[in-house]
Amino acid sequence: MLTHKTCQARKKMQVSFVIRDAEEKQHRNGVNALQLDSNNGKLYSAGRDAIIRVWNTRTESNDKYIQSMEHHNDWVNDIVLCCNGRNLISASCDTTVKVWNAHKGFCMSTLRTHRDYVQALAYAKDREQVASAGLDKAIFLWDVNTLTALTASNNTVTTSSLTGSKDSIYSLAMNPSGTVIVSGSTENILRIWDPRTCMRSMKLRGHTENVRCLVVSPDGNQVVSGSSDGTIKVWNLGQQRCIQTIHVHKEGVWSLLMSENFQYIISGSRDRNIIVTEMRNPSNKMLVCEEKAPVLSLGYNIDKTGVWATTWNSDIRCWKLPMYDRCTLSSGGMDAQWTMGGTELACIKGGAAIKECTVLNDKRYIITKDSQDQVVVYDVLRVIKKEELGPVDYEEEVKKRNKQVYIPNWFTVDLKTGMPTIVLGQEEVDCFAAWVSIEAGLPECDDPTTEIKINYGKLLLEALLEYWTPPHSMPPNEMEPDVRGNGYFQVPKHTPVIFSEVGGRTVCRLLVRDAAGDSESTLLHETAPQWVTDVVIERNIPKFLKIPFFLQPHPQMTKPERTKKDRLVANEFIQCRKVCEHVLEKVLNAETTPSGGNANNSLQNSQSDANSEGSQLPAEERIELWCNDVIVDPNMDLRTVRHFIWKQSTDLTFQYKTKQNFNFDGK
C-alpha cells in the first residue's frame, strides 16, 4: 500500500507560462479521449492542449461549447466519468491524476503518485474504483469515494499498487464489477490482475507490438485488444489464450469500442479508418468512415446511432453507424466495400495548432506558423499576441523581421500543446541573461539622458507574480510605497503560470490573477525557487554579464608609434559609442595629457566629454572602430559585435582610428 501526500522534495525548478486567449473554446491540438454523459448529453473531450472541454451534444447549434476544465499543463491522455456523472478523473503527461467536479468544472484534488506520463485509466462502475497506469510501469487503484472527499487539510489518500509490469503501460481496462483488470504495454503482452487481491493471475502473448487499446467483457471472461501491429485479438481468459485474430486495418489499432452485446467491434486506426466488424465472423465488416488523420478515440453518441471520433487533428466528428444486420460484404468483395462511406452527423470544430516557431534575434518576439498556415507574431515579454499576419511566407517574415542584434537566449519555447509555452529557468538557458537598453519599446524614463538597462527575465517574473504577497511578509512602511510588478507593464491576468521540476513533475499551477489568494500565496511560498524570490520579493538585481576585449590603434593611425594593446572589461550590452568615448577621453588624452586616465579602467564609469564646451561632435563621429576589417556601427553593443563580426572564441579585439579632420588635440 502506498500513501499519497502533497508535499514535495525541493528540486531544481523552472517557471513556464502559456500565451493564449482568456477563453480557449476550441481544442488547439489532437484529442486523446472522450466520455459521454448519457443522462444530459454532455460530451467531455481530453485535449493535447492540456484542456478538458465540455460540449452539449443535444443542441443543433454549431456552438456546442459549455465550459473548459483547466488545471493540467501537458497532454490529457485519458478521462473517465464516475459517480453517475458527478465527477471526472483525468490522466496527463504532466504525471498527475486529477479529480474534478464534472458539473462545475473545477479541479478538486491532484494525485502525484506516478513518476512519469500517466497514459491510461480504467473504471469499475459497480465498485466506484479507478485504476491509473503509465510510462513508469506502475498501476495504482483508487477508491473514487475517497478521492472525491479529499480537502486541503485532508489530502492524504491510500492506494493499492499492482506490480509486475516490465515496460511502459499504454492501455488499461476493467469490467464494471471490478473483478478483472488488464494492462497492455510495450512488452507486447497483456497482463491480467484480480484487483480485489492485487494479485496477477496471468499474462497473454500474441501481439508483436505495443498493445494500445483494451476492452473487457462485462462478465470478465473475454478481452479484446488492439495493437500497433495492426491486429485486433479476442482473448478467452478462462482458456488463457487468443481465440480470434482480426485483420481489418493496414496500420496500428489505437481505439476500440464494443456493442452492448459484445458481438461487434468498432475500431479506429492509424490508417485513419473506422471499421465495424462482427466478432464471430470477421469477414462481416463495414467501413464507417475514413477520417482525415489517425484515429485516437471513439465513443457512442447519446442514442448509439453514431460514433464520436477524435484524431491527431483538433476536430471532433460524429459518424452515422451502419445497421448491424446490414453489415455484409457486397458481391464485389473487399475492394467494393471500401467505397462505402459514412455520413457525418455532427462536427465540433477545433482550432489550429502551432507547428513552427522562430525566436527573433531581439529575443523578445517569436514568429509562429500553425496547422492552417497562419503566421502570428507574439510578444514574449508582454505575454500577448502582437500581430496576425495571415497565410504569408513564413521564412520571408522571419528574414524581414530579424535584426542584426545579438541578445542571449533567456527563454525556450515548447509547442507540445499547440499553444506557445514559454519556459524560464536557470539551467541550460539563464532567464536573467538578457540585459537590454530602455529603447526596447518600454516607457521612457523621466531623464532621457540617463541610460537605463533592463533585464527581460526580471521584468517578466515581476509581472507574472505581481499579485503575490508572501505570507508573514512585513507590512509596507508608510514612508515607502508597496512596490508591485515591474513599473513598466502588466501581463494578462488569465495567463497560466506553472512551477515544475526541471524535466519532471508539475508542482504548482495558477493564473496570474490568483496569486493574491491565501492558498495560492502559501503554495508559492513553499514552491517558488530562490532565484524567483530573489528578484520578485527581495527585489535583487541580476548580475551583469561582462565581456573582456582588447583595444589597439589601427595601422592607419597618424601616430603609428603607439602600439600598446589595452585589455578592458565591460558589460556586454555596452554600445560601441561608449568605446569611442573611452578612446577619445582616456586613450588619446592619455597620450597628450600627462594626467590622462588609465586605459585599463572598466568602461562602466567612463563619461564622455564629447559634447562639452569646445567639442562640436560626439565621440562616434570623431573616432572610428574597426573589428575584423569591418567598420563597427556605434549603435551595436559588444555582444552583437562579438557574435556577428568577430565570430571567434578568443577575446574580442577592436582597432580605433581618428576620422578625417580630427587631430589628437580634439580640435
Curated annotation (Swiss-Prot):
A GO BP term here is:
double-strand break repair via homologous recombination
Which Gene Ontology terms cover its molecular function? ubiquitin binding
- Segments for region (Disordered): 591-615
- Return the WD repeat spans: 26-65, 71-110, 113-152, 164-203, 206-245, 248-287, 290-329, 349-388
Keywords (A to Z) from UniProt = Repeat, Ubl conjugation pathway, WD repeat
Q: What domain of life is recorded for the organism?
A: Eukaryota
Oligomer status and interactors: Catalytic component of the Usp12-46 deubiquitylase complex consisting of Usp12-46, Wdr20 and Uaf1; regulatory subunit that, together wtih Wdr20, stabilizes Usp12-46. The Usp12-46 deubiquitylase complex associates with arr/arrow; the interaction leads to deubiquitination and stabilization of arr/arrow.
Function statement: Regulatory component of the Usp12-46 deubiquitylase complex. activates deubiquitination by increasing the catalytic turnover without increasing the affinity of deubiquitinating enzymes for the substrate. The complex deubiquitylates the wg/wingless-signaling receptor arr/arrow, which stabilizes the receptor and increases its concentration at the cell surface; this enhances the sensitivity of cells to wg/wingless-signal stimulation.
Record's family? Answer: Belongs to the WD repeat WDR48 family.
Q: What is this protein called?
A: WD repeat-containing protein 48 homolog
Question: Per the UniProt entry, what species is this protein from, by scientific name?
Answer: Drosophila virilis (Fruit fly)
The gene coding this protein: Uaf1
